[in-house]
Amino acid sequence: MSSNTENQRVNFASIKNPMKYPDFLEVQLKSFQDFLQLDTPPEKRKNDGLYKVFAENFPIADTRNNFVLEFLDYYIDPPHYSIDECLERGLTYSVPLKAKLKLYCTDPDHEDFDTVIQDVYLGPIPYMTPKGTFVINGAERVVVSQLHRSPGVFFGQSVHANGTKLYSARIIPFKGSWIEFATDINNVMYAYIDRKKKLPVTTLLRAVGFENDKDILEIFNLAEDVKVNKTNLKKVVGRKLAARVLKTWTEDFVDEDTGEVVSIERNEVIIDRETVIEEDHIDEIIDSGVQNILVHKEEANSSDYSIIFNTLQKDPSNSEKEAVLYIYRQLRNADPADDASAREVINNLFFSEKRYDLGEVGRYRINKKLGLTTDMDVKVLTKQDIIEIIKYLIELINSKADVDDIDHLSNRRVRTVGEQLSNQFAIGLARMSRTIRERMNVRDNEVFTPIDLINAKTISSVINSFFGTNALSQFMDQTNPLAEITHKRRLSALGPGGLSRERAGFEVRDVHYTHYGRLCPIETPEGPNIGLISSLCVYAKINELGFISTPYRKVADGKVDISDEGIEYLTAEEEEDKIIAQGNAPLDDEGKFVREKVKARRDADYPVVTPDQVELMDVSPQQIASIAASLIPFLEHDDANRALMGSNMMRQAVPLLRTEAPIVGTGIEKQLVEDSRTQIAAEGDGVVEYVDATTIRILYDRNEDEEFVSFEPALKEYRIPKFRKTNQSMTIDLRPTCDKGQRVKKGDILTEGYSTQGGELALGKNLLVAYMPWKGYNYEDAIVLNERVVREDLLTSVHVDEYILEVRETKRGMEELTSDIPNVSEEATKDLDENGIVRVGARIEPGDILIGKITPKGESDPSPEEKLLRAIFGDKAGDVKDASLKASPSLRGVVIDKKLFSRVIKSRSEKNADKAILPKLNDEFEEKAAKLKDILIEKLLVLTNGKVSQGVKDYLGTEVIAKGAKFTKRDLESLDYTIIQLSKWTADAHKNDMIRDLVMNYLKKYKELDAELKRKKFAITIGDELPAGIIQMAKVYIAKKRKIGVGDKMAGRHGNKGIVSRVVRQEDMPFLADGTPVDIVLNPLGVPSRMNIGQIFEAVLGRAGKELGVKFATPIFDGASMDDLNEWTDKAGLPRYCKTYLCDGGTGERFDQPATVGVTYMLKLGHMVEDKMHARSIGPYSLITQQPLGGKAQFGGQRFGEMEVWALEAFGAAHILQEILTIKSDDVVGRSKAYEAIVKGEPMPTPGIPESLNVLLHELRGLGLSINLE
């Protein structure tokens, strides 16, 4: 029974110890772990994720600062339902989030107000499953990571219509206003705030504290200060003034309304800037009473900075106050109430931590770009930042610096799940804190608690709308394990805050040299999203700042560090200007380069260098591709466009009934299955105790410490999924591959099925292929298939459909599930049970009733016949109508499962009986909890025996067991373990770790008991939890067995796709010399123009493998060479390149030319003809135009469009045309008459007027034109 024979593969890789792949789902799992930080004790949590969001929004105080609500900690309880239950019932797999909040009063008048600490329920948060997905309303969804523009400063360049180059610097924050510095055609620099308000840069500089011209010019070291006296002024005659000579004085005047004395600042310009000083200016300057004047320096530097002088010329303000007022007016289009409020507005724009946030990333990027050393905690702009940006921009104008490449991956970062959830929580908490403040202000003098202030709906509504409607929360592609894993590793540049398809140009979509080892250059969709949606490379990781990094080996003096320590992950920025050797450069055993010249890469350049110049080396040749691209053997021989199709089509491969791993693989198939978590894997070393089709039980080995801290038995049971439906209606049907008594190691795969065999990905079937034409049936990529493939179910798949019917309460009364349906024959209801649900095992044909349901009819006046019936049969007859669920026109299959979920509707006596049960449940729980705590205390006493306390504290930092005290049973029993800090109880670090693990395990078990109690209570009082408004929900699962047939789409792994054009009898297929007929005939003309020669390599090697019973791994860019192929074909006794003479199955004669006959791995894709075939008889019509609907889902017709009308006109087929445009379409009267005529066998009536003409006439009448048909 056990097929636990792992596929041993002959590996062609030249690199013998490649780096291990990181966990492929780390992108999702790690991000979510970092968001919740559940494994970290509260006192050690980093200021990150959810904790950070709370910290930013709390404490919350009321307007008078009397009451303060502080945040202490958050925690979550176990989920109410298991993942499977949520999938079955259409629920969300979530955990209750609770926060410990402290409310205290700072006002001495409220002496009666005590400090309150409470646990407050904040609503459910969807919780990530171990597979990296979320279950939302019963469907598995994935939150895709977003690739967006990193916060920071960007320098760009554009060209004006007149040819002038314009430069700009844009500062993009995480939150807050955008500010852009840009030059115009007159060489003046402006600052744009939020892309609309424009002001000279110097005005902004004055507003932030560089008040007069002197301060501004000193920043750039542009002017010379001259003390005003005759001697000095005579020396500078002939030089230009760098700043205005201003006479400043204050005037007092009385405000007539208030009687206050107000002083106002007055400025008078004596001599304007850029004026050349002459003799007659000297007296003017001395008379004006100024102390100093500024003149231009005589150095060359000032010509670079001419833009600053030009900008000063345009600057309307002369002092900080004027600048502030000017900016305020620009922003608000109104005058400020007073100076302070104007300053406040400017301060809030860039310097307020509440309103502006660069984020850690933004600060890091700005420091890096401008060479600053500002502290990473400063998340707002500083004056220094603004000055340095202006200086850099001026360097740019003078061609002394370069503009940024916006598509460089150091300028783009990834928002993973955790960060997206943090942003949503921040929105929710901000809304909640507003309502908290309002409630605090209202409840001024009464006593209230944190619970009274908080409305849990606020957060959950934001989170639910994110998971339900956000473009990045997607219905998981669950066609096969590869599709799942690829979807979780996908990076999208679309979505909120990202690009839009229409606006994205060519550059953003293109492959960039920084994608090397980070984003796959091959795997991206064809069509409008090309290049905007990409996949993470196999070795890539996302670092704390959200930049994608890739691993390299360190190289020093021509020697590569081949140890595990020699690997370092670098971001695109850190990799700049480094010389990197290729992954397959030959090395000796010590890690030295064998050749004197090494092919290397430096940014976008590929120099050949000497070994001592190399700084880094790729860890593997597979580094540049994603998982899907790495699965294509001989990828190096395929054109990239076809490889793209290949990697996209492997995700559409349908899981087959009989899985078979490829003979020619790439070696990544095993890791993919392990990391996809679709199979059951051993969690540790142990022994299989029991195994059958639905269950595996394993007894795990545990060491003494693990046994001691655990509250769970060592025996673990796993349920094997049977015929489970996936999102795409595929089947997950696993079977065990282990035997009773077998020893297993950690990570061993214990099952197979769902595109998996022997622990490896198995998407298709190894088929014997001949590349030759066959009677024209493989013209244009069509595929000729041997009947054996159909007969032996080689490409057969099972699909499961789920049909749901909900029972609601309507205005006219309750709906009801029943097999007693009015006006339906007994024959039609023979397979229904008493609830009206079809029995398991029934064969379903189109039109059969799956679930019977009746609905109360509307009360209308009964007809005479109905009155008679009611008089005879009582009132019940005829007031319900049939609302059953029937099989759709193309549905044929077998019922494999049915489920019924009901809410409990109870009478008063039943409710009273329940009340008696509930206290018993509580007592049971208390008893179990007490036992559990006793075990904990016993174990803690063992651990703390003879130890002295180092000071056990609760979460507030209060000592509950004093430092230096001995641990006693009484002390340990008195502790509330939910609020105790678990670090440093004793001086023994090992014992501390054990204490932490023990208490954490205890709390987990305690919460599980608590959750179980709640569930039992819920089941008694309410019944099955169902979505709102639904009383019962019936589900029927129907399995369809799909054999491959004409019209189905098949493909190889190299982008070689085609449609099955004919299934040929086995004896008519071309056969080999030994009489073996080939399984599939492909057109050789599909190869040369497509340039995917990899398929030929695969076919040749595959045939050698099949003959010898060997499997191969040929990793991409490091796989089998031509010589290796020849060596293996020789071993197998096959001709070179497998060129073989075939015989015609029909005549038995040998063909003239030899053809390539090999074994290729072929996939059956999810575009099956059975899902697409469709014919309409009589069906629904569109309401207004009265034309038939379109599409299979609506049981619609085929569109006969404008061009088709021309074709019939060209043939002069007037009667057919008239028929098509009237009675077959929208002549309402005509079509019913035609039906009548067909039934009675009479000749067809003449067609009438199409409804579309009436629609047109009505529209014209609506415009006020009186139109009548004569």
UniProtKB/Swiss-Prot annotation:
Organism: Phocaeicola vulgatus (strain ATCC 8482 / DSM 1447 / JCM 5826 / CCUG 4940 / NBRC 14291 / NCTC 11154)
NCBIfam families reported in the protein's UniProt record: PRK00405.1 (NF001616), rpoB (TIGR02013)
EC number annotated for this UniProt entry: 2.7.7.6
Catalytic activity: RNA(n) + a ribonucleoside 5'-triphosphate = RNA(n+1) + diphosphate
EC supergroup of this enzyme: transferase
Keywords: DNA-directed RNA polymerase, Nucleotidyltransferase, Transcription, Transferase
An annotated GO BP: DNA-templated transcription
Quaternary structure (record): The RNAP catalytic core consists of 2 alpha, 1 beta, 1 beta' and 1 omega subunit. When a sigma factor is associated with the core the holoenzyme is formed, which can initiate transcription.
GO cellular component, one term: DNA-directed RNA polymerase complex
Lineage: Bacteria, Pseudomonadati, Bacteroidota, Bacteroidia, Bacteroidales
GO function term, MF aspect, one: DNA-directed RNA polymerase activity
Family affiliation: Belongs to the RNA polymerase beta chain family.
InterPro entries in alphabetical order: DNA-dir_RNA_pol_bsu_ext_1_sf, DNA-dir_RNA_pol_bsu_external_1, DNA-dir_RNA_pol_su2, DNA-dir_RNAP_su2_dom, DNA-dir_RNAP_su2_hyb_sf, RNA_pol_bsu_bac, RNA_pol_bsu_CS, RNA_pol_bsu_protrusion
Full protein name: DNA-directed RNA polymerase subunit beta
HAMAP family: RNApol_bact_RpoB (MF_01321)
Protein's job: DNA-dependent RNA polymerase catalyzes the transcription of DNA into RNA using the four ribonucleoside triphosphates as substrates.
